[in-house]
């Protein structure tokens, strides 16, 4: 990436007012894009059409078109693990699967999809029941990372489409307190468990799975024990999504209840695969297919649209502009929809785990920064938390506002106020308020000149904060599919420009390795290579972990 070119382009932008860009009368129209389900207004970004054209040239120079083609065609773009990146193929028609995967693998994928659809159908119709013959009332999905965040964000986003007779819960954290609280609400005789782990060795997932298994077996009745039904509890009520079939079988899961995973589907992009089983159980096969259809439509847009009108490409270039040219280190994700409350957390993982790197694909140290720090919260809650800092600190925090124009609640006035707040915040972040404006307002009050001089500086707001506003008509499976695919592609494009491998996550591994060592030390093993700080903390834990809490 030509970082010098970016820096020279940004020279004027750093002292320019975004408001002044609206002297161009057609700016709102010219700096907006539409797809079949989404509308993007990026006119409040601090960028001109000339600068955007220069960014597009940079994208062309690094071979973005070829990279897009390579990803969709199955090139092994995850070079550190020697893998293709083909989550997109899972939402494509079967004929495309056959073209890219070949008949054998395409048929294997289709068989897995049909197996999953049958499970969903049989559970929802009461054909597949618990070991006591009862219909399932709850699904407990156990996973972590991509097998958690994707399911969680989709479940909340599509909560209005959920089967009311079947409650789906997701557990990820290894904290036993979270699991204990969840199990208190469940009936073991009517709970279906789905364990999601590619290797079936993930520490957090397997600890939680073993704890749930122990809970279920401890709940077994005397009659179950007399009839030797205990193995049936796991055999009939548990499913696994894994590539390690033998480990799942050894755990006690029926071979017919094991759905496959593939190494060319990364965890944080896996909701479109069999990992989506808990979601499909919640919303049904038809809606799950609509989710994939919405994503596929975004795929087609991404592959076939010129860069200037390509929504993922434009969002990616704007992110590059803000991160590397204007040097803003953060990105706020502010969905003005309670159903999208899990989106900021999902994008934290998808964005920062993908592009939070400092070496190129070839292993060279990069001379530019990569992924921003992503944070956010649902609106309007965020307005009463971190928005104070966004308005009045010296930090500029680029923001993505996301809103649905139509609500599903009977409280239509509430939704109108919600949308108004979304639009108002994007305007306020851009406009700000000068000292002169504040003083003029205060002069209309009964305050003295001295009081105005004291108060006025505290009411000024810097403004000039860039933002996107992403709009959809209504939260539907299709729009959510398009939204998730949009961010997937945006992150991929940024990875291409930053020249990083967006599909590995070696930074996660060091903590795992040290976690194993520290666990051994807690259990009594000596490890002189650990720091004095860690050894002291371990000693404190060993001395006090069995102390009865005073409260």
Curated annotation (Swiss-Prot):
InterPro entries: G6P_Isomerase, G6P_Isomerase_C, Phosphoglucose_isomerase_CS, SIS_dom_sf, SIS_PGI_1, SIS_PGI_2. The active site is at residues 353, 384, 512. The gene is pgi2. Pathway: Carbohydrate biosynthesis; gluconeogenesis; Carbohydrate degradation; glycolysis; D-glyceraldehyde 3-phosphate and glycerone phosphate from D-glucose: step 2/4. GO terms for biological process: gluconeogenesis; glucose 6-phosphate metabolic process; glycolytic process. GO terms for cellular component: cytosol. Catalyzes the reversible isomerization of glucose-6-phosphate to fructose-6-phosphate. GO terms for molecular function: carbohydrate derivative binding; glucose-6-phosphate isomerase activity; monosaccharide binding. It is an enzyme of class 5 (isomerase). It is found in: Cytoplasm. The keyword Isomerase applies. Its EC number is 5.3.1.9. Keywords: Cytoplasm, Gluconeogenesis, Glycolysis, Isomerase. This is Glucose-6-phosphate isomerase 2. It comes from the Bacteria. The keyword Isomerase applies. It catalyses: alpha-D-glucose 6-phosphate = beta-D-fructose 6-phosphate. Belongs to the GPI family. Pfam families: PGI.
């Amino acid at each position: 990436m030509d970082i010098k070119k970016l820096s020279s382009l940004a020279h004027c932008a750093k002292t320019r007012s975004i408001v002044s860009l609206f002297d161009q009368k057609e700016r709102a129209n010219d700096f907006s894009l539409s797809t079949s389900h989404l509308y993007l207004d990026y006119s409040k970004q601090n960028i001109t059409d000339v600068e955007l054209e220069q960014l597009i040239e940079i994208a062309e120079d690094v071979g973005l078109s070829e990279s897009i083609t390579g990803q969709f065609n199955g090139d092994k773009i995850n070079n550190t693990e020697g893998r293709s990146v083909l989550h997109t193929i899972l939402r494509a028609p079967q004929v495309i699967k056959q073209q890219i995967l070949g008949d054998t693998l395409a048929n294997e994928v289709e068989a897995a999809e049909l197996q999953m659809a049958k499970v969903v159908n049989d559970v929802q119709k009461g054909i597949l029941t618990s070991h006591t013959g009862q219909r399932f009332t709850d699904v407990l999905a156990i996973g972590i990372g991509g097998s958690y965040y994707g399911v969680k964000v989709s479940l909340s986003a599509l909560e209005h489409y959920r089967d009311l007779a079947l409650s789906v819960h997701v557990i990820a954290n290894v904290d036993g307190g979270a699991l204990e609280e969840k199990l208190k609400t469940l009936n073991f005789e009517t709970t279906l468990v789905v364990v999601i782990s590619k290797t079936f060795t993930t520490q957090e997932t397997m600890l939680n799975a073993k704890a749930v298994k122990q809970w279920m077996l401890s709940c077994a009745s005397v009659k179950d024990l007399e009839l030797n039904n205990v193995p049936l509890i796991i055999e009939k009520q548990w499913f696994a999504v894994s590539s390690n079939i033998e480990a799942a079988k050894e755990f006690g899961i029926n071979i017919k209840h094991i759905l496959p995973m593939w190494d060319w589907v990364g965890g944080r992009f896996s909701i479109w695969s069999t990992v989506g089983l808990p979601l499909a159980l919640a919303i049904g096969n038809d809606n799950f297919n609509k989710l994939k259809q919405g994503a596929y439509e975004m795929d087609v847009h991404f592959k076939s649209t010129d860069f200037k009108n390509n929504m993922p490409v434009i969002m990616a270039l704007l992110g590059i502009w803000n991160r590397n040219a204007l040097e803003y280190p953060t990105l706020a994700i502010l969905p003005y929809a309670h159903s999208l409350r899990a989106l900021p957390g999902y994008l934290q993982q998808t964005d920062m785990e993908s592009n939070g790197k400092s070496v190129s694909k070839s292993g060279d140290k990069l001379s530019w920064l990569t992924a921003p720090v992503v944070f956010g919260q649902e609106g309007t809650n965020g307005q009463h938390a971190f928005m104070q800092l966004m308005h009045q600190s010296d930090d500029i925090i680029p923001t993505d506002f996301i809103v649905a124009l139509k609500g599903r609640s009977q409280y239509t006035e509430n939704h109108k106020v919600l949308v108004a707040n979304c639009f108002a915040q994007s305007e306020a972040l851009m406009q700000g308020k000068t000292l002169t404006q504040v003083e003029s307002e205060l002069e209309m009050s009964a305050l003295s000149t001295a009081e105005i001089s004291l108060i006025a500086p505290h009411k000024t707001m810097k403004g000039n904060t860039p933002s996107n506003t992403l709009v959809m008509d209504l939260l539907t499976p299709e729009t959510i599919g398009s939204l998730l695919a949009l961010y997937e592609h945006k992150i991929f494009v940024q990875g291409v420009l930053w020249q990083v491998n967006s599909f590995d996550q070696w930074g996660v591994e060091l903590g795992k390795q040290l976690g194993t060592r520290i666990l051994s030390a807690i259990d009594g093993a000596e490890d002189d290579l650990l720091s004095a700080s860690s050894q002291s903390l371990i000693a404190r834990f060993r001395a006090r972990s069995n102390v009865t809490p005073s409260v």
